[in-house]
Amino acid sequence: MRIMIKGGVWKNTEDEILKAAVMKYGKNQWARISSLLVRKSAKQCKARWYEWLDPSIKKTEWTREEDEKLLHLAKLLPTQWRTIAPIVGRTPSQCLERYEKLLDAACTKDENYDAADDPRKLRPGEIDPNPEAKPARPDPVDMDEDEKEMLSEARARLANTRGKKAKRKAREKQLEEARRLASLQKRRELKAAGIDGRHRKRKRKGIDYNAEIPFEKRAPAGFYDTADEDRPADQVKFPTTIEELEGKRRADVEAHLRKQDVARNKIAQRQDAPAAILQANKLNDPEVVRKRSKLMLPPPQISDHELEEIAKMGYASDLLAENEELTEGSAATRALLANYSQTPRQGMTPMRTPQRTPAGKGDAIMMEAENLARLRDSQTPLLGGENPELHPSDFTGVTPRKKEIQTPNPMLTPSMTPGGAGLTPRIGLTPSRDGSSFSMTPKGTPFRDELHINEDMDMHESAKLERQRREEARRSLRSGLTGLPQPKNEYQIVAQPPPEESEEPEEKIEEDMSDRIAREKAEEEARQQALLKKRSKVLQRDLPRPPAASLAVIRNSLLSADGDKSSVVPPTPIEVADKMVREELLQLLEHDNAKYPLDDKAEKKKGAKNRTNRSASQVLAIDDFDENELQEADKMIKEEGKFLCVSMGHENKTLDDFVEAHNTCVNDLMYFPTRSAYELSSVAGNADKVAAFQEEMENVRKKMEEDEKKAEHMKAKYKTYTKGHERRAETVWTQIEATLKQAEIGGTEVECFKALKRQEEMAASFRKKNLQEEVIKQKETESKLQTRYGNMLAMVEKAEEIMVGFRAQALKKQEDVEDSHKLKEAKLATGEEEDIAIAMEASA
């Protein structure tokens, strides 16, 4: 039976499965997530996510602020890494690992510490106790069967993004649809067979939404315009494929968006190339990618009045340098006189403000780490003993206190500097321990007095102090006189013989100006060539030279060999010669660097008067040799070189072999800041190499910052020069686009009108023929209607005649009827009169 122990190094496939499972199941179902990984438990999966795979975890380099905060919190909350981690912004394992690394760096200064004895380093055969916080192992090309099976099962389970409940609902929905279709088919077949199996409606307590419309509002009776309502019903499109049901995948959507971006960029580049280039430059700008930190400038430490005094002193020294009469004299005379244009003597405070704010004493992070390491290694107070020596620290808050950075004031620095033997000596004060010098803190900025013209003449109350002052003055005078150089030149006065008078004086011919200029130019060139031959081979061949800043390092490296040797054993002639060569080399380097400085930026900005003053005051005097002596020395050096080649067996070596050997030696040289000298890297230790690489990295970083400032300055300058052209280009480009758009619209209209013309020409003949046929038909119709109209007029006239006859007959009949009525009335009237007469007679 095979027993599987869960754990071990995480692999790339396991990380990918874990990330996909967290995306599906969330960060609470670790048991279900661990079921996808055969070799990992739920606890290990959770630890892997929160220690490495979580996107919120910072995996960048630790900053100085984070280190300070970590050490401060470790001092306040020891071993409480889960409390410290969210404050620092890292995981607990990262905080613990960084804390131990800082303690190791602090312990490297201990002589008894050995990095090979670190118990945290894994030895061959040991198992990593915390593999969840380490990078994943790459997948092998040929995975075993267990890994393939695990991968396929995880792919199958993770592909089911809808879940079991959604599948069950879909299956029930399909069964219900099949049941309904079967019932409908059954009713249709029974109806076709003549069997009326009516479906009885079940009575519902509430509203039957299948038969009734809830909250229906019927339209009022009447006639209304339904033109807007007579619209064709939109055909509802239901999803029929799996892609339509599930929707578009995220990968397809992203690919489509990328294509749209590419097409949009192409259109933008084609239509508005300057704007597209400007947008690309903005995206590639390092200021956008890298968030610049806030510039913290210290408050000014020098007042305007003090700056004016410094400027006046520099202006006075420039006026003295411009005076040619003061700079005349030989090298010996200049060596005896003091130079007031140089920096004040050693021990005095410089007048210039430093270029940058000096750093604090030591590294604060290393100091805190050393404190914690000493506290960790200290014994319990129950055993007694001395307390460990700790650096100054504070427990004032949760986070370390920020230190205010200030630029030192050179005008106020002397008054703040404690007294010591290295400061400006003042007579009559407390003597130092060795009794050789007296020192105090100056009250203000000391004035330079190299010739002791303004020497203090204060008398001390104590006779002992006055005696010591006089002895000090005598000792300084005696040491100054012993340091005078030996006389180098012997002066001899030779009387020149009187010139012989020629019997026939030659006529003086006035020289032409062009000939004079050519002669002076030739003489100057000859003089320059003669001076060039007397210079060193480095200057003659224009070879690279060490800068002035590295002369101190070269001096220490050249003179360090003499300091290591014992003074008891007398030096050999070869050692004496080697020492003389090194001293001559150092003197020649300083002379060339002072008289022929490198053309760097600082030298270019300075004027010619500053260079003249420097060459006259700072150039060291060296021996002046004739050209013959120099040629003889070159000859001797060549002979010595040939002798060395023969004696060392290098006569058959080619120039390429010497170049290769020289390059090997040069590449092996490295500057070690711990020793302040150049030495061979092959024989140096790891700590020295690390310090050398750190120094080189710091120099490269400073160079990058300078280049970045140059680039920003050039960019601003470029914008200043091209802003108007860019605006003009944008205006012209807008006009061009408008013109092109109008031309495109005009071309489209022309094509449309041409097409209309062709269509009109084709349809004109057809319409003309149709119109002619319609005219003919209209004429025939009008002729028929005219004929019918004439017939109708005849019928109307005939009818009118008939009506006139009928009307005459009617009038005649009416007259006859009236006559008959009149006769009847007359008869009636006659009969009434007779009746009245009879009645009267009867009454009588």
Swiss-Prot record:
Domain named HTH myb-type: residues: 2-57, 58-107
Gene Ontology molecular functions: DNA binding; DNA-binding transcription factor activity
Tissue/organ expression: Expressed extensively in shoot and root meristems.
Compartment list: Nucleus
Role according to the record: Component of the MAC complex that probably regulates defense responses through transcriptional control and thereby is essential for plant innate immunity. Possesses a sequence specific DNA sequence 'CTCAGCG' binding activity. Involved in mRNA splicing and cell cycle control. May also play a role in the response to DNA damage.
UniProt record similarity statement: Belongs to the CEF1 family.
Name the record gives this protein: Cell division cycle 5-like protein
The organism of origin for this protein: Arabidopsis thaliana (Mouse-ear cress)
Top-level taxonomy: Eukaryota, Viridiplantae, Streptophyta, Embryophyta, Tracheophyta
